[in-house]
Amino acid sequence: MSINNPSAGKARPGTTLTVWTPEDKAFWAAEGQAIAKLNLWISVPALFLAFAIWQMWSVVAVNLPMMGFNYTTNQLFWLASAPALSGATLRIFYSFMVPLVGGRRWTAISTASLLVPAIGIGFAVQDPTTPYPTMLILALLCGLGGGNFSSSMSNISFFFPKERKGSAL
């Protein structure tokens, strides 16, 4: 099977994968490795962004009092923990999205959704009178990064043979 020969196989970039057998060494050498690496290179920036958004509140919450926000210590701890709680919950739902929507499409959609909490936080921290519930909602939305991170990791692992999953992930 050759990736340049249209009749050779069905696993080509830009199309829906109908055949995917990464454990088959001939398939892996002819088509699989190139497609797996392409998907990995696309996923790395998306994973970085997801992880950064997911962990953002652990830095933001610590600095809010110095920026003039009058939240209690308890409220600050909730802001720091909310992304982890919502991310763990969203992981359940996000795991089902790759088979339903497709890996590339879901990577694009879920990564684009990270703009909502990122831009929201950018505006919210500029005004010390931002209500706590608004900040909590933004913190919960940062959990989108946790769900994205976990679903993307499981999606990428699908592309590699068992012997190479460790080095890919």
Where are these regions (language model features)?
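Cytoplasmic membrane-interface "Motif A"-like loop-to-helix N-cap segments
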Residues: 99-111
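Hydrophobic core of transmembrane alpha-helices in multi-pass small-molecule transporters
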Residues: 117, 131-147
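Cytoplasmic loop-to-transmembrane helix junctions
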Residues: 75, 164-169
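Intracellular juxtamembrane helix-capping segments at the cytosolic ends
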Residues: 147-161
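Central cavity-lining transmembrane alpha-helices of secondary-active solute carriers
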Residues: 78-97
